[in-house]
């Protein structure tokens, strides 16, 4: 695991482990033997590894909140919007109270960093993630409305979004915005969702995956975000099948086929599988991978 990405990876994995997969901490299935060779199983009388992972991650995240209320990419670094949004989102969905000091400080950071135009950093992904965090915290409707208006304005005539307002169409940023809209509850009848989904659908590769540049090798990370964004509008069964075929033997996912498993990519991939209501054990195998590679510090 790369140290300079550890905080971002942790938060992504934490989000995934607790709410993206739809598995309760006390699920009976947590006492089953691991289906992946090399990953240890455990007895029903022992504390489930998933529970340990979640609790350790919660503690680690809270301990590394900065004084300004935000969270950094790496402990001791400067706060940034993306990690702060993910931290708020994940903690609340894990049962952290919206009125707690930790959440209130995080919300304050997002409130203080919104730009006058309604965006966060003039960045479409940062903006939608901040909106999800504030909506999850059930606060600041006026700020959220202002951010939503900016996102609608930033959508290109093609239906896509770029990184910033009036920047070139980008598959990953379009997918991230649509995934955020999905979390916010917007459906096909919301024009930005249907237009954006149509643009993404037209950008598909021949193998049912997506890449940053159409026609290049399909990218598991990009495709996993796209799947989440398309789910409210399109049937994604073929994309779920494509994704499952690329899972590594250890249960994780790499960026491309046969590449080493990566925690962040695995987390995003399982969020995509959850969006597709995958009926098999693919998500479960990935969870075992993520719990097995957790560092001692949480």
PLM features per residue range, with description:
Residues 57-63:
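Mature N-terminal segment immediately following signal peptide/propeptide cleavage
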């Amino acid at each position: 695991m790369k140290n300079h990405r550890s905080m971002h990876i942790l938060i992504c994995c934490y989000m995934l482990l607790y709410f993206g997969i739809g598995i309760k901490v006390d699920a009976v299935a947590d006492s089953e033997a691991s289906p992946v060779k090399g990953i240890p199983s455990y007895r029903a009388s022992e504390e489930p590894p998933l529970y340990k992972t979640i609790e350790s991650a919660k503690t680690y995240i809270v301990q590394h909140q900065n004084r300004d209320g935000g969270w950094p990419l790496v402990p001791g670094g400067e706060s940034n919007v993306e990690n702060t949004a993910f931290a708020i989102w994940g903690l609340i969905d894990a049962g952290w109270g919206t009125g707690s000091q930790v959440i209130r400080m995080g919300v304050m950071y997002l409130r203080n960093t919104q730009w006058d135009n309604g965006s966060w950093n003039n960045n479409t992904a940062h903006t939608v993630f901040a909106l999800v965090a504030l909506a999850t915290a059930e606060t600041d409707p006026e700020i959220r409305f202002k951010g939503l208006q900016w996102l609608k304005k930033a959508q290109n005539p093609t239906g896509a979004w770029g990184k910033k307002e009036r920047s070139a169409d980008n598959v990953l940023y379009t997918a991230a915005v649509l995934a955020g809209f999905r979390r916010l509850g917007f459906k096909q009848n919301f024009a930005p969702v249907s237009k954006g989904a149509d643009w993404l659908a037209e950008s598909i590769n021949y193998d049912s995956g997506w890449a940053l540049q159409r026609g290049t090798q399909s990218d598991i990370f990009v495709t996993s975000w796209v799947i989440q964004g398309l789910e409210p509008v399109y049937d994604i069964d073929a994309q779920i099948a494509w994704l499952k075929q690329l899972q590594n033997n250890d249960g994780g996912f790499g960026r491309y086929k046969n590449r080493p498993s990566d925690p962040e990519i695995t987390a995003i991939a399982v969020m995509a599988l959850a969006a597709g209501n995958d009926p098999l054990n693919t998500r479960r195998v990935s969870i075992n991978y993520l719990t097995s590679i957790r560092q001692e510090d949480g």
